[in-house]
């Protein structure tokens, strides 16, 4: 029998947790920190893309328009929209023979 097997095999009366009746504040703090860490890790895995996209791009959706005349705002909106619009006439059909 290897040493590892002997270490992994507990004695019957040692199956219970030794810290059940412990009122040590360090044990309580470690338990709370462990639970919070687990919750935060799960939330991080679930909302990974959303959270890091927020950090990367911030809370704003675009540049601030404060103090910019309305005509310039409209011009900016039109440029943004024209960059998004796709002209259907410029597609190229490639036929493989």
Curated annotation (Swiss-Prot):
UniProt activity-regulation remark: The M2 protein from most influenza A strains is inhibited by amantadine and rimantadine, resulting in viral uncoating incapacity. Emergence of amantadine-resistant variants is usually rapid.
Q: Where is this site: Essential for channel activity, possibly by being protonated during channel activation, and by forming the channel gate and the selective filter?
A: 37
Relate the assembly described in the record: Homotetramer; composed of two disulfide-linked dimers held together by non-covalent interactions. May interact with matrix protein 1.
Present the record's domain note.
Cytoplasmic tail plays an important role in virion assembly and morphogenesis.
Q: Which residues lie on this side of the membrane: Virion surface?
A: 1-22
Q: Which GO terms describe its cellular component?
A: host cell plasma membrane; membrane; virion membrane
What is the species listed in this Swiss-Prot or TrEMBL entry? Answer: Influenza A virus (strain A/Wisconsin/3523/1988 H1N1)
> Which residues are annotated with the PTM Phosphoserine?
64, 82
Instruction: Please state what the protein is called.
Output: Matrix protein 2
Q: Which gene underlies this protein?
A: M
Transmembrane ranges?
23-43
Q: Which residues are glycosylated?
A: 20
Main localization (coarse): virion
GO biological processes: protein complex oligomerization; symbiont genome entry into host cell via pore formation in plasma membrane; symbiont-mediated suppression of host autophagy
Q: What InterPro entries does this protein's entry cite?
A: Flu_M2 (IPR002089)
Q: Name one GO molecular function term.
A: proton transmembrane transporter activity
Q: Does the keyword Transit peptide apply?
A: no
Record lipid sites (S-palmitoyl cysteine): 50
Q: What does this protein do?
A: Forms a proton-selective ion channel that is necessary for the efficient release of the viral genome during virus entry. After attaching to the cell surface, the virion enters the cell by endocytosis. Acidification of the endosome triggers M2 ion channel activity.
Give the misc comment.
When the channel is activated, one or more imidazole moieties of His-37 probably become bi-protonated.
The record's subcellular locations are:
Virion membrane; Host apical cell membrane
């Amino acid at each position: 029998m290897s040493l590892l097997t002997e270490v992994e095999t507990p004695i019957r009366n040692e199956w219970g947790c030794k810290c059940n009746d412990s009122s040590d504040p360090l044990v309580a703090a470690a338990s709370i920190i462990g639970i919070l860490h687990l919750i935060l890790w799960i939330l991080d895995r679930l909302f990974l893309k959303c959270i890091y996209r927020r950090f990367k791009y911030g809370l704003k959706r675009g540049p601030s328009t404060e103090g910019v005349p309305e005509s310039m705002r409209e011009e900016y909106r039109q440029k943004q929209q024209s960059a998004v619009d796709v002209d259907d006439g410029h597609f190229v059909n490639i036929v493989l023979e």
